[in-house]
Amino acid sequence: MLVPKRVKHRKVQRGKMRGEAKGGKTVTFGEFGLQALDSHWISNRQIEAARIAMTRYMKRGGKVWIKIFPHLSYTSKGVGTRMGNGKGAPEGWVAPVKRMKVMFEVAGVPEEVAREALRLAGNKLPVRTKIVKREEVGGQSNED
């Protein structure tokens, strides 16, 4: 599973996730990508479940790029704990994903296989998703 090797701060504030992603909105490495249509925190377990769903459907063919990394810890207090007494203990790791961010990319498999693999991966995630195709530069192919 994806976890950071070291972090500067063990506990972080939640912050806000407003607006679209600033970068990573296009398919850069592969041929097809899975794009988020909502903003949400995605845990390292959800990322791993999506990766396994894709690679199993593709029968270990092709290549998968994971373009998000869970670098923030999330905390929770015990169930019967009263208010106050500080912030809870770190429970796991999350990746903040904003709207329009491409989270996964796939290459090296036929289009229908890639689309089905990305659809299965999207079912494992807590956001609505869209499958996007890599656009050619300027609407033309680069075969000059």
Curated annotation (Swiss-Prot):
Ranges of Basic residues composition bias in the record: 1-16
Residue ranges, annotated region (Disordered): 1-20
Protein name, per record: Large ribosomal subunit protein uL16
Family named by the database record: Belongs to the universal ribosomal protein uL16 family.
Role description: Binds 23S rRNA and is also seen to make contacts with the A and possibly P site tRNAs.
The protein's assembly and partners: Part of the 50S ribosomal subunit.
GO CC annotations on file: cytosolic large ribosomal subunit
Record flagged with keyword Disulfide bond: no
Keywords in alphabetical order: Ribonucleoprotein, Ribosomal protein, RNA-binding, rRNA-binding, tRNA-binding
Pfam family, one: Ribosomal_L16
UniProt-recorded Gene Ontology molecular function terms: rRNA binding; structural constituent of ribosome; tRNA binding
An example Gene Ontology biological process: translation
Gene3D superfamilies (alphabetical): Ribosomal protein L10e/L16
